[in-house]
Amino acid sequence: MQNMVILGATGSIGASTLSVISANPDAYRVYALVANASVDKMLALCITHRPQVAHMVDSQAALALQAKLPPELNIQVSSGEDELIALVTATEVDTVMAAIVGAAGLVPTLAAVKAGKRVLLANKEALVMSGELFIEATKASGATLLPVDSEHNAIFQCLPEEVQANLGRCDLAASGISHILLTGSGGPFLTAELASLAAMTPAQACKHPNWSMGPKISVDSATMMNKGLEFIEARWLFNTQNDQLKVVIHPQSVIHSMVQYRDGSVIAQMGNPDMRTPIAHCMSYPQRISSGVEPLDFFKVGQLSFCEPDFNRFPCLALAIAACAQGQEATTVLNAANEIAVEAFLQGQIGFTHIAKVNEACLSSVPKRAMTSIDDIIALDAQTRIYAREQLAKLA
């Protein structure tokens, strides 16, 4: 029986994780649920899954949850960063699902890694921001790191065992690998007229053709910044050079990514677009458990198509690839700028095409600094957010 902590329990990844746990009740136990401020959602999850601890990042939300929880459930309610770190590093905890969206997930995820936990990484921003520090912490602690993102999980499944066992430190060329092919659907605006993009609304941007996701990642998919962040994450997870990574547009989201070998072979991982599949794989690796997902029906799949990304349509993807080549400081700046810009777009403060403009302005203007600690990363992140908000004021 594995005791699990779910960071981001009220989000879409949290819901999918709890679904897999419910399908395998003899193998997994919900030790703790962690959320930001969604009291009613957390209350419902507590009643259903009976965790030992419910942690709310927002202190007022924690008080509200405590008042609403039936006392007979005997669930401890906590709040605060120190309490969260103590939770993910507790000796009772075996596995941590790291699914808090954005920079907010970095500190608890890194704490779980340093404690040597089995970490299921759905928070791509942790690697985008801290890259080498994160990988070195994994190596030092002996933590098990497993990628949950559908693309990185697909790549992982297509790799030989010696690479799977050495994430972040592997040598792809030595294992006969020539390229990693990172697939992406192109999002809801793949075929939209370029001139129409400036007028796209948050509702339109969040209407992904294949996946059910939260608002932030949905907008990132529409700009293809999500694929850019995944490009950066893949660079660290699989220790790649930029020329070993290629982005392929695949609108149907049936092939989740591919690995191309030196002998001309290409191994692909396929399946229905449902996050329960990669979550179940990570939870049970190297074994397999039921995810509750229907298997792919090849007689109903139809045509699979592929094309190269259009960087005029997706400037955020181009920015991310360029930032990856520049190094850790640039990717930290880009992530912070993008979080501010996307939130402003979702609130109706800026237009869709302004997201890329804010990101580009921050990348070109925020002074870079050497980053040797988590404090350096947090400081650069904070500095970038201030500058990004200044750019928003100019666009308003």
From Swiss-Prot:
Signal peptide feature range: none
Key words of the record: Isoprene biosynthesis, Manganese, Metal-binding, NADP, Oxidoreductase
GO molecular function: 1-deoxy-D-xylulose-5-phosphate reductoisomerase activity; manganese ion binding; NADPH binding
Binding site for 1-deoxy-D-xylulose 5-phosphate: K124, S150, E151, S185, H208, S221, N226, K227, E230
Keyword Manganese in record: yes
Residues holding NADPH: T10, G11, S12, I13, N123, E125, G214
Pathway(s) it belongs to: Isoprenoid biosynthesis; isopentenyl diphosphate biosynthesis via DXP pathway; isopentenyl diphosphate from 1-deoxy-D-xylulose 5-phosphate: step 1/6
InterPro entries named among the record's database cross-references: DXP_reductoisomerase (IPR003821), DXP_reductoisomerase_C (IPR013644), DXP_reductoisomerase_N (IPR013512), DXPR_C (IPR026877), DXPR_C_sf (IPR036169), NAD(P)-bd_dom_sf (IPR036291)
Function: Catalyzes the NADPH-dependent rearrangement and reduction of 1-deoxy-D-xylulose-5-phosphate (DXP) to 2-C-methyl-D-erythritol 4-phosphate (MEP).
PANTHER family: 1-DEOXY-D-XYLULOSE 5-PHOSPHATE REDUCTOISOMERASE, 1-DEOXY-D-XYLULOSE 5-PHOSPHATE REDUCTOISOMERASE, CHLOROPLASTIC
Descriptive protein name: 1-deoxy-D-xylulose 5-phosphate reductoisomerase
